[in-house]
Amino acid sequence: MNVVSQDVFKAGSAFSGGVTRHGETCGALLGAIMAIGALMGRERLPDKEQSQKAMVPATRVYDAFKEKIGHTLCSEIHKIRHGKAYRLYIPEEKKAFHDAGGHGPEGCPVVCGTAARIAAEVILDLKESSSK
């Protein structure tokens, strides 16, 4: 399996806070799925077969994340972890999110770590399967 380019990380920079801090799909989940796509996805648009091959492990990541975290939307994850959704694009609410522990031990670091762990497990399973 190829090593993922640093450009992939750069490309995902605006995913935080549920895509540009708007509470949509969790950026950590998107990053985990991007890692699967970077390793297994198609290289050319017409290659639908390869695209479909990436869907199976990407779906595993999505389903496991939703099961462990409780939701895939950043705003809903806020509610689960902090009791309310924060609009992170509003400076006062972003500060309130930080004050509520948004980046503390039970906040985003746990969510990001969970997404990374799930992606790593799926990637290791793929690597093991391909070496058999």
Segments the model singles out, each with a brief description of its role:
Residues 1-10, 38-60:
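Phosphate-handling active-site elements
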Residues 55-132:
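C-terminal binding/interaction regions
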Residues 34-41, 117-121:
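Short glycine/serine- and small hydrophobic-enriched flexible loop segments
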Residues 9-13, 33, 113:
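Short amphipathic alpha-helical segments
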Residues 3, 24, 107, 111:
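Short, contiguous, pocket-lining structural segments
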